Swiss-Prot record:
Residues 177-430 form the PI3K/PI4K catalytic domain. Its main location: Golgi. Belongs to the PI3/PI4-kinase family. It comes from Encephalitozoon cuniculi (strain GB-M1). PROSITE patterns: PI3_4_KINASE_3. Component of the autophagy-specific VPS34 PI3-kinase complex I composed; and of the VPS34 PI3-kinase complex II. This is Probable phosphatidylinositol 3-kinase VPS34 homolog. Residues 321-342 are annotated as: Activation loop.
Amino acid sequence: MEEWDGDVFTWNAGKEDIYTLIESILRLLKNGCKGMENMVVKYLGTGATDSLYMYFPWLRGRDLESRLSVEHQIDRFWKIRFELHEERTNSMDRYEDIVSSFLALDTKCGILGKLEGQMALVDEIRRIYSITSQGSPRKKRLREYRLHGTLCLHPGAGSMRLYASLFSLDATVKEIIFPEIEIFPSSTFPILVPLRTDRGVSRIIYKKGDDLTRDLFVLETIRYMSRLMGVDLVTYKVIPLSRKEGIVEVVDGIDFTRIRSRKDLEMYIEEDRDPRHQESFEKRKVFVSTLCGYSVACYVMGIGDRNPGNMMVTRDGKFFHIDFSHVFGRDPKPISSRITIARPIRDYLVNDELIYQDFLARSGEAFLQIRRSCRKIFVLWCILAQNRIFQFDLNEIIPFAQARLRMEMSEQRALELFEKEIRGAVGSLKTSVAHLINRVGMFLRR
C-alpha cells in the first residue's frame, strides 16, 4: 500500500476492511510517506489550503507556508505551544524547526506581533479569572462580588490597552469591557469576556477545569460532516491552552435557557413575520436542516450532557450545539437520551405536521450520508489522532461510531432503527428529567 497514488488510494479506501485500512493509514502517516497528505486531502475532498494540513505531523517549515493561510498558521502556533507546554514534544530539532518557521513567517506577514498581542490578552483574562476564583466559592454571586469589588477598589484594573484578537486576525482589541463580564453558573464557573474592537464588540469565554482538546476534535469533525451532508452547520474556534484550560469563541445567538416555549422560538427565528413570506419560510428550513445535521453528528459521536444551556440558535435560524466535554458515550448523566431535543423544539416540531415530517426525512438523509461516508470520517480521525494534542483511542472511538451507524446491518435496517431513535427523542421523558436536574443544579450554583 506504500506505493499508492491518489486513484489507488481512493479505490483501496473504499474496498478494504476498515481496520486494515486504518492500520495502513496509520503506518503511512507514521512513516511520513511522500505525498501522502495530498492523497488524503484529495480523498477527503477538502480544499488545497485547508486547515487539515496543520495536522500532518511531518509537514514543517516551508512545506506549510504555501498550504496554510496566516490565520491557520496562528492556529498551528497555539497547537504547537500546547504540545510543548505539555512536554510531549521533546526534540530540540523539532523546537528549532518551529522557531525558524515562525521567524520566516514574521518576515513575510508580521505574525510575531499578532501572537504577542494575543498572549498578552490571554494573560489578562487569566488574571481576571483568578480574581473570581479566589477561595474557590461555589456560588456565582460570590464570584461576581469578588470581581466587581476588585474593580471598585482598583479602577485602574479596567484601563484601556491594545491587544490582538484571538479569533479575528485583522481586528485590534481596544478594551476589555470589565463591567459586562459574566460568570456562568456551571460546575467550573467559566467567564464570558466582552471585548471592544475596531470592528465592534466580540465575546470570548475562558474556561478552567475543562479539556478543550475534546471540543477541538469534535468541531473539526463537525466541520467535515457539514461538507459531507451539504448543510452549513455553525462551528466556532477553540484554543486549548492546557489539558484544563482554554478559550472559546462566542457565536452570536441565544441558548435554550432563554427560549422556554414554542412561541419564544417562533418569535426568535421568524421575527413575527407572516409564515407565508419567503424569508420566514427560508429561516424555518434552515432551522430544521441544521437541527437535523447537529442531531446526527451528536448521535454518531455520542456527545453527552446535552441541556438547554448548550443548545443555541442564531438570528438567521441556524441551530447548533456548544460544549463538547463528554463524547463517545461518556455522559455524566446516565439517564440522558442518545438524541436530545429540547422541549421548545419538540413543541415547535409537533405543532406542524409538515415541519415534523420534514425533520424526520432530513434526519434520515443526514444519517445515511454520514453512514455512507464513514470511512472518510475515520481517515480524518486517523490524521487527528496522530497529533499529541488529542488523546483519543481509535480502537475505542471507531467501533463506537460504527455501532451508532449500525454498520453490521443493511442500510435499510439501519435507517429504520435510526428513525425509531429520532422519533423517540421527540418528547423523550429522559430528556425532560435530565433538563430538570440541570436546572436545579444551576439554581443551586447561583
